[in-house]
Regions:
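Juxtamembrane boundary at the C-terminal end of a transmembrane helix
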Residues: 230-241
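Cytosol/matrix-facing amphipathic helices and coiled-coil assembly/linker segments
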Residues: 2-25, 80-162
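Transmembrane alpha-helical segments and their cytosolic interface motifs
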Residues: 22-44, 148-174
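Residue-level signature of catalytic and energy-coupling elements of molecular machines
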Residues: 35, 74, 123-127, 165, ...
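Small-residue-rich segments of transmembrane alpha-helices in multi-pass membrane proteins
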Residues: 217-230
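Transmembrane alpha-helical segments of integral membrane proteins
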Residues: 190, 194-209
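Internal alpha-helical transmembrane segments
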Residues: 2-79
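Hydrophobic alpha-helical transmembrane segments
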Residues: 29, 57-62, 158-162, 186-190, ...
């Protein structure tokens, strides 16, 4: 069995491209949940400021949740489908060039490894061995930065975005509906700001940035959204709309 550490002290770290892909998916999920929290919170707080009717608040919240989740899913599907089409076109071009001009492609791969600091002889040997093992994958990864067997699935991206948005949107919706009428808005604001602080901290840690600044940005943004919609709801209530 291989030791899990190098020299008994340094644990192996995940270097595979799949790890970075999983991090990107997790970060996108956090951002999707954040969108659901902010947009739904703004909507239900605005409606609750205009009326205390539970059915009206519930209907507005469910409508906003559904529209937001579908919008996220459609947008993500279109975006990822376009990206995948472009990646497939690049991969098809690379496969064609490997069949038509293999010597040129080998020289190109050699140059890539020379640019990374390998000596000409070593770069040539690496290029030849990788080409002999799996020429298409070697060239796709080195030249295009793509793994032909791990292209993003647009349906998976759409479903993940919709689920993340829905989970985020459920928090302010439940927070506005469950408490007594007089406590609805304060409880919702508190729950939303705490949730935004959590998502801001998680996204900052995933991205390696300062969590304090990230939390402040997202919390202030969410507070501003709720303040604006609360003001609009109050104006609608006063005007009798």
């Amino acid at each position: 069995m291989e030791d899990s550490t190098i020299n008994g002290s340094h644990p192996h770290e995940p270097h595979a491209g799949g790890f970075a892909t999983r991090l990107n998916w997790l970060r996108a999920g956090v951002l999707g949940a954040n969108d659901g929290i902010v947009s739904t919170a703004g909507l239900v707080v605005g409606v609750a400021a205009a009326t205390t009717t539970t059915s009206a608040i519930f209907t507005a919240g469910i409508a906003g949740l559904s529209a937001g989740a579908l919008s996220m899913a459609v947008g993500e599907y279109v975006s990822v489908s376009t990206q995948r089409d472009s990646e497939r076109a690049l991969l098809a071009k690379e496969r064609r060039e490997l069949a038509e001009v293999p010597d040129y492609e080998l020289a190109e791969l050699t140059d890539i490894y020379r640019a990374k600091g390998l000596s000409p002889d070593t770069a040539r040997k690496v290029a030849e061995e990788l080409t002999a093992h799996d020429a298409f994958t070697a060239h796709a990864e080195a030249e295009l930065g793509l793994n032909p067997r791990a292209l993003t699935n647009p349906w998976q991206a759409a479903f993940s975005s919709a689920i993340a948005f829905t989970l985020g949107a459920l928090l302010p919706l439940l927070a506005i509906l469950l408490p007594p009428v007089t406590a609805r808005i304060p409880v919702t604001v508190a729950a939303v700001l705490l949730a935004l602080a959590l998502t801001g901290s998680i996204s900052a840690r995933l991205g390696g940035s300062d969590p304090v600044r990230a939390v402040l940005r997202v919390v202030l943004g969410g507070a501003l959204a709720m303040l604006v919609t609360y003001g609009i709801g109050q104006l609608a209530d006063v005007a009798g709309i």
